[in-house]
Amino acid sequence: MTSVSECFQSLRDRKQCGLIPFITAGDPDLETTAKALRVLDASGADLIELGVPYSDPLADGPVIQAAASRALRRGVKLEDVLNIVKGVQGDIKAPIILFSYYNPIFYRGIEAFLEQIKSAGVKGLVVPDLPLEEAETLLKPAAEMGIEVTLLVAPTSPIERIKAIAHQSQGFIYLVSVTGVTGMRTQVATRVEDLLKSLRNTTDKPIGVGFGISEPEHALQVKNWGSDAVIVGSACVKRLAQGTPEEGLKAVGEFCQRLKQAIQ
């Protein structure tokens, strides 16, 4: 399993747009999550975002909130999530990026949290509610441990703030395509194209676009606008939760293949 930066460099060398599916750990259950990581990897995922269930997920829309609630009701904890990551080491090529809110990190202690996720094999970290002003407290120790912390750029951010975020973000820059929470939308905001151009003038770091991408044609549109990767969350979580675990795995695998075909 390579680092996040190495994966993006490989994509760039091959002139390819990356696919980053997101799933919530523990939904519908831990065993299915482990299988889903393998299925996504085999179905074209270049990197995989794995969400740690949290009781107050402010950035998440109804689909991911519901998945997190189901996982929490089953008693899923960070340790369970990391055991899954450990269990798939050697089976998958795609680096795993952990998606966690800041409170569980702060509660455990930054150093202890980072040591835990590093030993499990996590390569990257996205913390949606991490303020830029406090980012250094996490970025510095994470970098020393080889974990890349990716920061989010909101479409409403002033240009100076965008520059500051782009400068500090590690691995890639996570461009939020819409204001508000994650979720499936019928179209991708055309403002994303302008934001991508603005970011390109600011940094040469890879850019991944997420929030609101729910169809292969959305992924292709974002790729054509110049994104280095497309991030698809709610649409994957919804499919994985459909029917039996076996049906969910089949649905999310086929969807991932369709997304990959669209951007190749």
Swiss-Prot record:
Keywords: Amino-acid biosynthesis, Aromatic amino acid biosynthesis, Lyase, Tryptophan biosynthesis. GO terms for molecular function: tryptophan synthase activity. It comes from the Bacteria. Pathway: Amino-acid biosynthesis; L-tryptophan biosynthesis; L-tryptophan from chorismate: step 5/5. GO terms for cellular component: cytosol. It is an enzyme of class 4 (lyase). PROSITE patterns: TRP_SYNTHASE_ALPHA. The active site is at residues 49, 60. It catalyses: (1S,2R)-1-C-(indol-3-yl)glycerol 3-phosphate + L-serine = D-glyceraldehyde 3-phosphate + L-tryptophan + H2O. Its EC number is 4.2.1.20. The alpha subunit is responsible for the aldol cleavage of indoleglycerol phosphate to indole and glyceraldehyde 3-phosphate. Belongs to the TrpA family. PANTHER family: TRYPTOPHAN SYNTHASE ALPHA CHAIN, CHLOROPLASTIC, TRYPTOPHAN SYNTHASE, ALPHA CHAIN. Tetramer of two alpha and two beta chains. This is Tryptophan synthase alpha chain. The gene is trpA.
